[in-house]
Amino acid sequence: MRAIILAAGRGMRLKQAEEDQLPKCLLRFGGMTLLERHLRLLRSAGVEDVVLALGWRHELVSAELDRIDWQPRPGIVLNPRYELGSVLTVHTVAEAMTRGGDVLLMDADVLYHDRIMAALTAGSKPTNRVLLDRDFEAGDEPVKLCVRAGVPIELRKQLAPDLKYDAIGESVGFFRFDEPGARRLAAIVSDYVASDRAHLPHEEAVRDFFREGSHAVEVADVTGSAWIEIDFPNDVSRAAHEVLPQLRPL
């Protein structure tokens, strides 16, 4: 199993002071960067093959890897046009996506309980899997995951008013793909780039993968497990004061 961590973006909505600007994966909680937390949680799940998709201030991420002396050292793939969007970032890691075996595709800017990692990586059988949190705040920001008859049918911030579903929640931003699934997603992403849609979020390509219906996808319910995606200044405070106290020491 291989983990691909998407950490190329600048995170403009976080509004960091210019002298303090860091890639979001280098934000610290409990004295540990999000990057180190990802690596520790992946190792605890038996995942040592890690690829980092980097862009903005990538040298700071490399310096953090030097500081913690993480071995085996994660591979690094650079997206020099990171400002375009995450579809292009996923396209830059196409080789890692299609190298074989199950692939975990993970946003870097998430602080989360180890139960979420366990749900993502559970089982030795190859599978496609998405994580659902039914306890989410309504609004335009969460990426909603809609499920009907156990099958994911929608993955978007904005939903059609007449959409019929059995369950709805927020997508945690972590996905698992088996080898055929990863190859198909890489092909969809390549089509996006070739058709001038590289500026779109990669969830749009994942949505297409789900809606094709040609690959079975499991939905793992992680409701009740603490996590937060860090996009805005208030998210940093919530991560430190609401989520971090619920996490087990790493």
Model-derived features: where do they sit?
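Short catalytic helix/loop segments, enriched in acidic residues and glycine
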Residues: 20-36
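Phosphate- and divalent-cation-binding pockets in alpha/beta enzyme and binding domains
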Residues: 13, 60-63, 115, 184, ...
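Conserved N-terminal catalytic core of the sugar/cofactor nucleotidyltransferase
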Residues: 2-5, 32-102, 195-197
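Conserved alpha/beta core of the MobA/IspD/sugar-nucleotide pyrophosphorylase nucleotidyltransferase superfamily
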Residues: 1-3, 167-250
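N-terminal nucleotide-binding beta1-loop-alpha1 segment
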Residues: 1-18
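Conserved beta-strand segments of alpha/beta enzyme cores
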Residues: 25, 73-75, 216-218
